[in-house]
């Protein structure tokens, strides 16, 4: 369980980084050339989601390590679903962050009613969110099904339940 605790702590830290990135002015400056993005958009598009994906992958890998389940057709199917979730999660991050930047900078957060701004606003506030949640749900469902098919060999003790619960509460906030 030590590896799981470390990975869950990594996810909690990643959420903290995402919150600091979004809710503070530390990352409000522009990237060059042409002020093509803000640092906050860049961080939320590449390093933060990448860290999330890596942590999810390592959780999946830890769940099935040494298991004969990895040789089954169900595992192959679930792994393809995981890759699909990763792709959708990544595509949505790219779509959302760029259109969020454009919407904020050129469309007055959706208040400008031109055709271009309507398209940007829709990609920012709706389409990218649908794709994000589909990817996020797929990755989580795969982890749940993997855990179901390869139950932990060692029983969780009270300390494990406390640690997992604290991480869940932090992530849930």
For each feature predicted by the language model, list its residue ranges.
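Alpha-helical transmembrane segments of polytopic membrane proteins
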Residues: 37-51, 92, 127-136
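Alpha-helical transmembrane segments of multi-pass membrane proteins
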Residues: 12-29
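Membrane-interface interhelical connector segments
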Residues: 99-125
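N-terminal membrane topogenic signal
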Residues: 1-13
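Hydrophobic alpha-helical transmembrane segments
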Residues: 117-141
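Transmembrane alpha-helix/helix-exit interface in multi-pass inner-membrane proteins
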Residues: 88-108, 144
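Transmembrane alpha-helical segments in integral membrane proteins
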Residues: 52-60, 132-154
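Hydrophobic alpha-helical transmembrane segments of integral membrane proteins
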Residues: 87-92, 158-173
């Amino acid at each position: 369980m030590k590896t799981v605790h470390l990975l869950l702590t990594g996810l909690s830290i990643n959420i903290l980084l995402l919150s600091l990135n979004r809710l503070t002015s530390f990352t409000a400056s522009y990237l060059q050339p042409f002020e093509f993005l803000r640092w906050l958009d860049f961080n939320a598009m590449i390093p933060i989601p990448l860290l999330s994906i890596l942590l999810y992958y390592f959780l999946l890998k830890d769940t099935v390590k040494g298991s004969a389940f990895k040789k089954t057709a169900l595992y192959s199917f679930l792994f393809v679903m995981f890759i699909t979730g990763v792709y959708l999660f990544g595509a949505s991050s790219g779509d959302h962050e760029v259109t969020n930047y454009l919407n904020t900078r050129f469309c007055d957060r959706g208040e400008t009613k031109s055709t271009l701004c309507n398209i940007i606003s829709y990609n920012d506030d709706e389409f990218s969110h649908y794709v994000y949640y589909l990817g996020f749900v797929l990755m989580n469902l795969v982890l749940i099904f993997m855990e179901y098919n390869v139950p932990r060999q060692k029983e969780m003790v009270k300390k494990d339940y406390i640690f997992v619960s604290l991480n869940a509460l932090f992530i849930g906030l």
